[in-house]
Amino acid sequence: MKMTTAIFDLDGTLLNTLGDLCDSVTYAVEKHGFPPVSMEQTRIRIGNGVRKLVERSIPEESRTDEMIDICLADFRAFYGEHMMNRTHPYEGIVSVLETLKENGVTVGVLSNKYDSAAKALIEHYFGDLVSITYGERPNIPRKPDPTSVLQLLDELGGDKETTLYIGDSATDMQTAVNAGLTAIGVAWGFRSAEELRASGADALAYEPSDLLPLFEYGVPDVSKAEKALTGYGFGFHYFATKDEAVSYLRDTCAGKSVSMGGSMTMKQLGFPENFADSTDVHWHWIDKGVYCQTPDVYLSSANGLSETGEIVNIDGKCNRVAATLFGPKRCIFVCGVNKLRPDLQSAIERARNIAAPLNAKRLNKKTPCAVDGRCHNCKSPER
């Protein structure tokens, strides 16, 4: 099902506002003789509105309503003048918003930041890419109460079934759950992927480009992929966190010879560093030759995976495809849910129009897809 409406959180989702928030709350509390706050302290205190941020930054013994009001006024005065000093969109976010607009998706923003600041930031950084912005408003409860998000959804003309709510905190996930919306947690913000999952995230995005297929195809159905792949004789294990996946792989590979093809997924899991203490590890970029073709276990990822049970890899030199067909005693594919698509054709499209352009750009290849992110079925010698 295609999604037609997006509701984004602001801080930690669209914009990295941490520096300006930290500077402003430090100004407000230092003015009254209290200790400055660090970036980390600011990060963990964000999410329930600026009053809560200020309150949590005042020492407990001085945390009266009067002092909170005074510091909050100082915070707002300073932040109003400095909210765009260090704030910036997360890399790739503007491109995602542009693509959503081109595809007819209506975008709104809901923030616990006070309304005038939220509107000013959205106007400055995103302009008409966002249709409507709501910040904290008088006499309307803040997130995770669903009142504001349901008002915003109504004004955007969306419906619950085709709307994604996207945010970086437990508050955001709870807001979506309370409103009956699909909750997408972004792992580049101020909270961990584990916290987002525990708070009700239906899916996670680890980089902005992960959001686009969620609008095209909806949230991937892991259970369908499991049924299809096990039906074809594959083993299947699902892990909610990176640490769980690493633990399983370490236990499975302990005492064995292991090799890996070119895989950014495996590098992100810490291969070979996380495995070298208990495993005879070989990586084809470092260890050339036959040994890498005849291990006990071969670890790889895939460019695409389908809910109908197909695994898609497109290789320049066939290092991964060949090793999965011949040589190793056992092959384990390690894939993020972001690679899962409804069917074979959409999995191939992911390989061509997401994986291949990203790899070409990463490897500094001068192919057309490295420029515009779309496969041209080119005859480039660097392909």
Language-model segments: residues:
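Active-site neighborhood of HAD-like aspartate-dependent phosphohydrolases
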Residues: 1-44
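Metal-dependent phosphoesterase signature
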Residues: 32, 56-95, 103
